[in-house]
Regions:
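Extreme N-terminal starter segment of soluble prokaryotic enzymes
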Residues: 2-5
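Acetyl-CoA-dependent GNAT
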Residues: 8-12, 19-95, 99-101, 112-113, ...
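Short amphipathic helical patch at the helix-1/turn junction of helix-turn-helix
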Residues: 98, 132-133
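Conserved G/P- and acidic residue-centered "switch" motifs that form tight phosphate/ATP-binding loops
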Residues: 106-108
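Conserved GNAT acetyl-CoA-binding A-motif
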Residues: 119-132
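Conserved beta-strand edge residues that scaffold enzyme active sites
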Residues: 133-134, 156
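Helix-turn-helix
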Residues: 138
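Conserved active-site tyrosine of GNAT-family acetyltransferases
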Residues: 142, 147
Length: 160
């Protein structure tokens, strides 16, 4: 899969972001999270009105640096990420999801690099991520990129 690029999400991307996040949660956490916690997670993270509102928030607010989308050939969205710098010096990855057919092709890494660049621009010296489950399937991805456990569900890496 060839990655066309990473860009800031536009209003027309909201439905795709919502669907991709919900599908990723369902497929990644089946058998890890019980049905009710999974529904709550999807309801909290993937609600279309929430994502539409977040896309409309102008960039430049450190706590929320916006949604990014990765596109494949033809402009199809194949991955999404969101982050911010909620505490001075600490970047936070709020979401990162990649279409199953685009995984292991550098899409997640490209999204994380773009989000990290934004966070550095707002003074982040450390980057954190919190997982919905201790046995999160994304742990190897984050470990490969230099993250280490602060607690079973919270990981961090220095940004040098």
């Amino acid at each position: 899969m060839q990655l066309a690029g990473v860009r800031t999400a536009a209003a027309g991307d909201a439905t795709t972001i919502s669907r991709l996040l919900a599908d990723t949660i369902r497929s990644s956490y089946a058998g890890i999270l019980d049905e009710i916690p999974m529904r709550r997670l999807i309801s909290a993270q993937c609600a279309l009105p929430r994502i539409r509102a977040e896309i409309e928030i102008p960039g430049g607010a450190p706590g929320w640096l916006g949604w990014l989308v990765a596109t494949g050939p033809g402009g199809t969205v194949v991955g999404v990420a969101a982050g911010g710098v909620p505490v001075p010096g600490e970047g936070e990855v709020y979401a990162l999801a990649v279409e199953p057919g685009a995984r292991r092709a550098g899409v997640g890494t490209a999204l994380l690099v773009a989000a990290t660049d934004r966070m550095r621009g707002y003074g982040a010296r450390e980057q954190r991520v919190e997982f919905p489950a201790e046995a999160d399937p994304a742990l190897p991805f984050y470990a490969h990129l230099g993250f280490a456990a602060l607690s079973p569900r919270r990981w961090s890496r220095p940004l040098v």
